[in-house]
């Protein structure tokens, strides 16, 4: 498997259920994840509980909801060897909607309500449109926006600065399938970030 770090101990649990007999729905999916990861010093570095529910309607539209809770943990990486700090417990909520992907024009909308490491709100929203005139060509235009009240940056020697930030990220992708084995893809993306110093930490 893939490890995000070389001093990691994991004990995770995943549950996934697909129901195809739910009244008024084509499909209902439920997933439950428990993430429990520690470093070799015995400190919790990644903890989380996730409950996800997806509803696929008879007209093939999809509604998603995700609830998340991150218990208190230790961040031992952002400081790059200058020290660890404690991250308080945080909550999160995701809402999503997608229209029928088989239509020539399909739309998607997502809302993400979360918290930064220091506790203040982090809000994200995205929308997309997909144009698929035939089975060989498709284009996808997506726009993401993120508003953060406490973007934490390590400035060196154990000094940190939190920023109020706003980020826009448009993305355009076009695909053309020459045949069953060959595909051409063109992707253009751009990210704009504006940040203002807010508080200083040591």
Positions of the model-derived regions?
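Exposed, low-structure sequence patches enriched in small/polar residues
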Residues: 1-202
